[in-house]
């Protein structure tokens, strides 16, 4: 029966050993494998022993891959499994590795959710909705998602959300109704709930200088009028222009006044 004739430390990796049977190189083994089987020179090993050693070493190599992957940041089961699958590690070994990671608390979904919550609140302008999606994508259980999303919403300072809203609002020009609509949409895209958005909207100042609004209306009038003048003329052109500007949030009386001011219609002409 085969006998272990030499066990030597690998030159490039001091945590692994070369195992020789009957003076021939057999395989490399992990430090933990070496200790686990209490391997030593002169030990007799049969085929069944070698199969156990090989399987255990494959498992230990997979554990080390997982530990290396987890060393950069917190991960979930789903993320570790995907990483190990890319390394073409068998499903049975992966399952054992995940069990090991949980036993050693290397993977903890509650800790993961809590850490992500704190990081996102401190470093991003995103709301609970985006937080929920990130946890779902990472494979966190729904019960944990619900608990930590609620904590996220409770812990995120309202003044921070208002700052985000003000930053967005500065970039949105035009009628108040449209600015409100665009701000609401932008906040929803960032993951804020209807309830939070309603509170924020009540805190916002949507006022704009009248001269600025007047200038914007003039610009929009010229664009809309020129666009429809390619297809329409006369009363139809005027009505299409008014409809187009009202869809953009401008009020009828302001549009009518601007049409008259621009000389497109006179003050005596009725506009439908």
UniProtKB/Swiss-Prot annotation:
Name the GO cellular-component terms: cytoplasm
Give any single GO term for biological process: regulation of DNA repair
UniProt source species: Staphylococcus saprophyticus subsp. saprophyticus (strain ATCC 15305 / DSM 20229 / NCIMB 8711 / NCTC 7292 / S-41)
UniProt record similarity statement:
Belongs to the RecX family.
Report the protein's function: Modulates RecA activity.
Record-linked PANTHER family: REGULATORY PROTEIN RECX FAMILY PROTEIN
What is the name of this protein?
Regulatory protein RecX
Enumerate the UniProt keywords alphabetically: Cytoplasm
The UniProt gene name for this protein comes to recX
Which ranges does the record mark as transmembrane?
none
């Amino acid at each position: 029966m085969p006998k272990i004739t030499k066990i030597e430390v690998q030159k490039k990796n001091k945590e692994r050993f070369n195992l020789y049977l009957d003076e021939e190189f057999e395989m490399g083994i992990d430090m933990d494998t070496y200790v686990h089987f209490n391997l030593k020179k002169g030990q007799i090993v049969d085929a069944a022993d070698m199969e156990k050693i090989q399987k255990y070493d494959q498992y230990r190599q997979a554990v080390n891959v997982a530990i290396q992957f987890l060393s950069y940041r917190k991960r979930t089961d789903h993320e570790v499994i995907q990483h190990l699958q890319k390394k073409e590690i068998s499903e049975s070994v992966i399952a054992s590795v995940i069990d090991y990671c949980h036993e050693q608390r290397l993977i903890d979904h509650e800790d993961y959710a809590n850490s992500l919550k704190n990081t996102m609140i401190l470093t991003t302008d995103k709301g609970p909705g985006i937080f929920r999606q990130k946890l779902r994508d990472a494979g966190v259980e729904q019960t944990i998602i619900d608990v930590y999303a609620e904590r996220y919403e409770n812990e995120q300072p309202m003044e921070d959300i208002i700052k985000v809203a003000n930053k967005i609002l500065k970039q949105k020009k035009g009628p108040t109704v449209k600015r409100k609509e665009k701000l609401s949409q932008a906040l929803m895209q960032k993951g804020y709930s209807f309830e939070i958005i309603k509170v924020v909207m009540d805190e916002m100042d949507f006022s704009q200088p009248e001269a600025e609004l007047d200038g914007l209306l003039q610009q929009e009038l010229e664009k809309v009028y020129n666009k429809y003048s390619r297809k329409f003329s006369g009363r139809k052109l005027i009505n299409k222009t008014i409809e187009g500007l009202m869809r953009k949030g401008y009020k009828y009386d302001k549009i009518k006044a601007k049409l008259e001011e621009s000389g497109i219609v006179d003050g005596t002409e009725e506009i439908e």
